[in-house]
Amino acid sequence: MAYPFQLGLQDATSPIMEELTNFHDHTLMIVFLISSLVLYIISLMLTTKLTHTSTMDAQEVETIWTILPAVILILIALPSLRILYMMDEINNPVLTVKTMGHQWYWSYEYTDYEDLCFDSYMIPTNDLKPGELRLLEVDNRVVLPMELPIRMLISSEDVLHSWAVPSLGLKTDAIPGRLNQATVTSNRPGLFYGQCSEICGSNHSFMPIVLEMVPLKYFENWSASMI
């Protein structure tokens, strides 16, 4: 999860988030190299006589500054398209969870089970226990099995919402009348926090998301106790 004064991304917990982190570093390095080159040329022009006021045509230079940006864009686009395809592809999910956004809470339905559904509200600050996180804890966590592909079907009952869990690389819009989907896969057990990431009204900041990823055996025991 995030912590105060954090500069980088949250620790990756899913394969998708690991890919996104690597792509971020890849793109950031390209931006850094381009910025360094531009600043170097500007400094040379300001401190030396590196100017050609009489040059009217330079075919070689024009060719270079046309081809080079195209190559750079390809180096960015190819890994981006690969990750986009990975995020969209869902192969044989073991579980499907339907998520509905409301003003201002989330409701969840495990479609593979009968009568396994609940609402998830933020716990008010006055009701928090020692060690719990303000504005991030909920009364009913979403319990899911780890290391298995899970499909989330996401929509909304009223206005636009966005279901986001940064450490899993998830951010999917919840749109009334439309069903979006996302893949959830966690490499390790634990609690993973998120929030609504679309301004949806006065209590927008009070719509936390808590995923509890557990081994399959514990998930089966939990689901049996909930039915």
Curated annotation (Swiss-Prot):
Residues that bind Cu cation A2: 196, 198, 200, 204
* BP term (GO), one: response to hypoxia
Residues given in the record as Cu cation A1 binding sites: 161, 196, 200, 207
Q: List UniProt keywords, sorted A-Z.
A: Copper, Electron transport, Magnesium, Membrane, Metal-binding, Mitochondrion, Mitochondrion inner membrane, Phosphoprotein, Respiratory chain, Translocase, Transmembrane, Transmembrane helix, Transport
Q: Which positions form S-S bridges?
A: none
Superkingdom of the source species: Eukaryota
Q: Which cofactor does it need?
A: Cu cation
Instruction: List the ranges whose topology is Mitochondrial intermembrane.
Output: 1-14, 88-227
Mitochondrial matrix topology ranges: 46-59
Which EC number(s) does UniProt give?
7.1.1.9
Q: Which residues carry this modification: Phosphotyrosine?
A: 218
Output the InterPro entries linked to this UniProt entry.
CcO_II (IPR045187), CcO_II-like_C (IPR002429), CcO_II_C (IPR034210), Copper_CuA (IPR001505), Cupredoxin (IPR008972), Cyt_c_oxidase_su2 (IPR014222), Cyt_c_oxidase_su2_TM_dom (IPR011759), Cyt_c_oxidase_su2_TM_sf (IPR036257)
SUPFAM superfamilies the UniProt entry points to:
Cupredoxins, Cytochrome c oxidase subunit II-like, transmembrane region
Question: Which GO CC annotations does the UniProt entry carry?
Answer: mitochondrial inner membrane; mitochondrial membrane; mitochondrion; respiratory chain complex IV
Q: What does the record note about the cofactor?
A: Binds a dinuclear copper A center per subunit.
Q: How does it sit in the membrane?
A: Multi-pass membrane protein
- Chain segments annotated as transmembrane: 15-45, 60-87
Positions with a binding annotation for Mg(2+):
198
Q: Which family does it belong to?
A: Belongs to the cytochrome c oxidase subunit 2 family.
Function summary: Component of the cytochrome c oxidase, the last enzyme in the mitochondrial electron transport chain which drives oxidative phosphorylation. The respiratory chain contains 3 multisubunit complexes succinate dehydrogenase (complex II, CII), ubiquinol-cytochrome c oxidoreductase (cytochrome b-c1 complex, complex III, CIII) and cytochrome c oxidase (complex IV, CIV), that cooperate to transfer electrons derived from NADH and succinate to molecular oxygen, creating an electrochemical gradient over the inner membrane that drives transmembrane transport and the ATP synthase.
**PANTHER family, per this entry?**
CYTOCHROME C OXIDASE SUBUNIT 2 (PTHR22888:SF9), CYTOCHROME C OXIDASE, SUBUNIT II (PTHR22888)
Protein name as annotated: Cytochrome c oxidase subunit 2
Q: Which organism is it from?
A: Rattus norvegicus
